[in-house]
Amino acid sequence: MKHSPLRPVATRCLASLWLGLGAWFVHAQDTAPEARTEETSQARYQSTYNTQQHPAFASAGASFNSLGAGADRMFTFSLTGHWGKRLDSGAEVYMNAELASGVPFTNNLVGLGGFTNGEITRAAGSTPKPYLQRLFWRQTWNQGGGREWLDSDFNQMARWVDKNRFVLTAGNFSTLDVFDDNAYAKDPRTQFMNWAHWTYGAFDYAADARGFGWGLAAEWYRDNWVFRLGRMTGPKRPNELPVDWDLLRHYGDQFEVEHAHHLAGQPGKLRVLAFRNRAITASFSDATAYLRSHAPASDADRQTIFQVRSGEKTKYGLGLNLEQALSPDAGVFMRAMKADGRSETYAFTEIDASLSAGAVLNGRGWGRAQDHVGLAVMDNRLSRARRQFLEAGGISYFIGDGTAFRYRPERGLETYYSLGLNKHSWLTADLQRLHNPAYNALRGPLTVYALRLHTQF
């Protein structure tokens, strides 16, 4: 499917209009005196434009699921409104609406385990399209232990809460809104861009193709501990947009334990997360057997996951997430997860074991308190079953280079510098270097350059 040029006129006009409105709104807001006042309603907005390009890279072969080896460009644009209201009962209701556009490399989301732009799942072509992103209810029951202040943020109204509390979230939201937080690597609009950095690469969390679902999540805050449990809907068919509403049979379950601590006087948090998915998916052993028993006449015949996608499968994963401040201006993070990888990807990306680690430094030390710089490395691997399928010449949903395949872990480095333009806008330059894209030693390395403009108020 072909798209119009990289920077369509409609997107540029929308971005300019949005930034102009943002400047007007910011001027009005900056005149108000600062005070610690609880919010009873909220209206916040963000805009992000991310353009990326890569030069040509080495390739010994390819299929329709391979990243194109020639020089290429891609972009994403998003414009989001976040609105919230506190009810008389103390509950909060939030609604988010988004306008998004974008075109991936190769005009298709293929050819990598760790994709290079976290916004690309929301894009559906060069023409901006609106959609309802979130609609959820949150109730907090305070249980003592002292008070703490929650700052105003997207989908969080400024307020006082008890340190010990129980929180229930229900409706349409993202699993990542509640689970797998990290101060240094969480938001691809402001921090690292690669999928394997802003969450666990192997976390096949239940969601539609845009990354959202319907469900419930409970959180119990107790002293330095937090316990979280949730169940979310997934797609009717793996990696697609329509929702499977049979939440009793097909679902994604998450359980997370978090502990806050101090190390050498600096705060940190350690999280352990387990997930379980149940859905109608293909097993890689069945797909490999089918491929070997039916001589493929074309690359399309090698995508045998579609021929054996029957019967319910259960998928498990376990991960460890660490964030640790080294000083008020510097911190490090690490995520590691292993999933069983016996069945195809349900809703995220094709990674079965992931390791990501890095550091972030604030620019206060050189007189740029609004700036920050980050550096991270990643290591993505496949399960034995998925690897054997690819080695047999199979083509999966996002990856598979056909017969020109020699397995190696997909490894990469990402670094960025985020320049604060004013109180509400940042311009980020980003560099990613990926070895063995889509786990194929016969392709790459791949270098991706990115420029991102983000505004929020």
Feature names for model-found ranges:
Residues 30-41, 55-56, 84-93, 142-165, ...:
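Short loop/turn motifs that connect adjacent beta-strands in outer-membrane beta-barrel proteins
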Residues 41, 75-81, 131-135, 166, ...:
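Hydrophobic, lipid-facing positions within transmembrane beta-strands of outer-membrane proteins
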Residues 43, 47-51, 95-99, 168-172, ...:
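Transmembrane beta-barrel strands of outer-membrane/channel proteins
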Residues 85-87, 97, 139-141, 172, ...:
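Residue-level signature of outer-membrane beta-barrel architecture
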Residues 110-127, 131, 146-252, 256, ...:
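Surface-exposed coil loops of outer-membrane beta-barrel proteins
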Residues 133-146, 375, 445-457:
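Outer-membrane beta-barrel "beta-signal"
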Residues 195-322, 327-332, 336-343, 350, ...:
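Signature for the C-terminal beta-barrel architecture of outer-membrane proteins
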Residues 256-258, 273-312, 333, 340, ...:
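Outer membrane beta-barrel transmembrane domains
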